[in-house]
Amino acid sequence: CGAQVAAPRTRVVSLKSEPSAATPARGDMPEPSDPEEFFAATQKLRPRCLEALRERMDGFLAARRRLQQRVVLLTSGGTTVPLELNTVRFIDNFSSGTRGAQCTEEFLKAGYAVVLLHRKGSNFPFLTNTVRQLNEDPLALLGHSTPQDAGAAHLTESLLPIGFTTIFEYLFLLREACRSIEVAGADAVVFLAAAVSDFYVPENEMASQKIQSRAHDGLSLQLRNVPKLLGSIKQWAPRALVVSFKLETNSNILLAKAAGAILKYGVDAVCSNLLHNYRDLVTIISEDPLAQGIRISSGEIHGEETEPIPVEGVASVRIERGSHSTIDQPLAQAVIRLHQDRSPGKTEAASQERALEPPEKRLRATPAS
């Protein structure tokens, strides 16, 4: 899962990712459990004061809606996977939260109210430069006031940050935030920029106390699939524009994987990118409303394909970093335009405009490698 074990004073002999007698091959892994079964089975590791947090979200959104603001639920940063109920050791997804923080800034500047589900300790809106300095040269910050965007104080009135650390906290908070944001209807965006763990240890399979480093000859773990909640988001907030992310290392499967997420989970758009240039290029994939559905010319995708998988019935918007300091500014602006284009009253006009485009542009899209 692109993860590392963060464990002081522990020896980890194997975190198996290859097939073995104890660990099934990836293709043989059991399907993720039903999301509601996951929530019902998690009692001790759910967020504290969840009901109070929901009330905060409801109150914040009600106030911003009285001001007729559009709203976005934005997730940012990585999630941890605890290995014990009384957690000492955990698996962590690497994510600085920079993309989420900087996209939050753009949504705020565009007049949106933002509910920010962020990893505690990750980058934060209007403070990314300060965090970078803190990591690179902390002594240089001593004796200096913290730099801040001139308009940040005013903009943050429209920001509600809620922190998480574990995969359990993230999924519970995501469900409540989606249900809360539904009050905004089509004026809502769900922007899923968090780096969410793919595998986890269920609560009922965890050690209750710290795993003793000398009790065994090393440590072997079998992880379960994290339930996929993308399909549930459209149940919790059916009128919101849902934007997810897809990162791959093989350019030949990227478009097919992005289109597959639209087909399988019903998301409205997928920000697709490749690992080697994700800071410089993102392609937003969405379904072409004038095409006769999305068609992917492939069966099972193995990840080792040497030729691009043809995909039809999608529209693409290529976002390049260009002269911007990061790609996140033009990326967020493109999502804002997409949301505006789908507003009531604009959808029909946009469809008529799209009808005038050449069919080859409407029916086929291939993100650059």
Feature-to-residue mapping (PLM):
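A cross-family phosphate/adenosyl-ligand binding-site feature
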Residues: 9-19, 24-369
